[in-house]
Amino acid sequence: MIFVLDVGNTNAVLGVFEEGELRQHWRMETDRHKTEDEYGMLVKQLLEHEGLSFEDVKGIIVSSVVPPIMFALERMCEKYFKIKPLVVGPGIKTGLNIKYENPREVGADRIVNAVAGIHLYGSPLIIVDFGTATTYCYINEEKHYMGGVITPGIMISAEALYSRAAKLPRIEITKPGSVIGKNTVSAMQSGILYGYVGQVEGIVKRMKEEAKQEPKVIATGGLAKLISEESNVIDIVDPFLTLKGLYMLYERNANLQHEKGE
């Protein structure tokens, strides 16, 4: 059984794969202040709830865009699982040809998504990941990672309205009853949702025009389903794209180590 861990700025998503299939997954808040023991006890409870234990896990891979949290997570893996985790970063074999000016600037989550997207859906491809930031990644027909777009995430936009406008409340991100809001909350919900749908459609349209291609558009992340239901440019929603990519990278690198006799 392989344990995969995707750490974002707001949430961390954990999963366990068995024989190539995602058996279970969990989502928890990213907490930069938790210790290795606190993370260990939390993961222990999650596993035990599914009838699993640390001993069932034979390998671990971690992707993180939050560097301060990595020490605690690596120590947790070594202390409780007795396994040194594979970390997505320099030295890991991704198989990606990255055309960024500085490939090291490409976030681990974007690399993992690209690996999974190419394997599952082919190319050319646009991957939209609705996280703390919303990222758009373009992979051309030759399976080269060409770059993309980064925008503030939906929750950041909603929180900015709440924190910077004294009379506007904090809202739930959900579809309002109508585009034309009849009260402050529904007007804000309409602005956030349909404003974001417009952003997605506009950026995807411009990316396609610049690439002179008609790539398939894959959406992932917590709010992908909500946005896709209102948009006409998203072809597939894959909520577990990142976890699948982590598993693929683990298998690829574990096989390479085995071939080298490590």
Curated annotation (Swiss-Prot):
Its EC number is 2.7.1.33. K(+) binds at D129. InterPro entries: ATPase_NBD, Type_III_PanK. ATP binds at D6, V7, G8, N9, T10, N11, A12, V13, T132. Pathway: Cofactor biosynthesis; coenzyme A biosynthesis; CoA from (R)-pantothenate: step 1/5. Its main location: cytoplasm. GO terms for cellular component: cytoplasm. Keywords: ATP-binding, Coenzyme A biosynthesis, Cytoplasm, Kinase, Metal-binding, Nucleotide-binding, Potassium, Transferase. Catalyzes the phosphorylation of pantothenate (Pan), the first step in CoA biosynthesis. Belongs to the type III pantothenate kinase family. HAMAP family: Pantothen_kinase_3. PANTHER family: TYPE III PANTOTHENATE KINASE. This is Type III pantothenate kinase. It comes from Bacillus mycoides (strain KBAB4). The gene is coaX.
